Amino acid sequence: MLLNFLVNFYLLIPVWLIKIICIFNKDIKREYIFDPQSKLLIYLFPKLELQNVKNDEIKNLRSAIEKRRTNLRISKKPKKEIKKVDHYLDKDESILLREYSPYKVDNKNIILFFHGGGYVLNSVFTHDDMVAYFSEKLRTRIFSLDYKLAPENKFPAALENAIQAVEWLEDKNISSANISLCGDSAGGHLAASLTHHFTNEDKK
């Protein structure tokens, strides 16, 4: 319960307010100013016995974050309506690939996007506004993958889902040469891992 409260409280605080709070109390480490958001996060959150965190607590944390991200709308939204189509990579419809198509598309290239969250948190829905905004600004179709999360799904589940997404796109006559990989935080790591995977495949 305490963890959920702290997450909700932390997500409600605007960045500009955090910077004002910390402006007269800067921490300097190795000649660098410590990021105010990180400083507040460390201050608010108690040391957690991570081995005692249960799956139910993780699910509650996910739910709290998703609720805040979707209700607060902290990302910029596109000016024009973006067409969104949900595709599924499996028969059980457990792996979602959401397609974003802007009003005007400049080229045949597409972006395959992976959300961040330490492979444990977030989803296509927490990053929905952000990806739609990018699609409009870049005038490019973007596919956002809702890969399976840990700890329920062990490594390499997320990577396998990402491989499935590329194969699905290729089945739709989209050349791999026209696919750019992109992600934030853990999503960036997944994009790099996927690149490494296909680079090794090409060497075989």
Positions of PLM-derived features:
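Short beta-strand element of the alpha/beta-hydrolase
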Residues: 108-117
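Primarily recognizes the serine-hydrolase "nucleophile elbow" in alpha/beta-hydrolase
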Residues: 164-204
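A glycine/proline-hinged amphipathic helix-loop "lid/cap" segment
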Residues: 1-99
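A generic structural signal for alpha->beta connector loops
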Residues: 78-81, 94, 139, 176-178, ...
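A fold-wide structural signal in alpha/beta-hydrolase
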Residues: 110, 139-143
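Short beta-strand-to-loop junctions in surface cap/lid or active-site-entrance loops
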Residues: 96-109
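Catalytic nucleophile-loop/oxyanion-hole region of alpha/beta-hydrolase
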Residues: 123-124, 130-131, 143-178
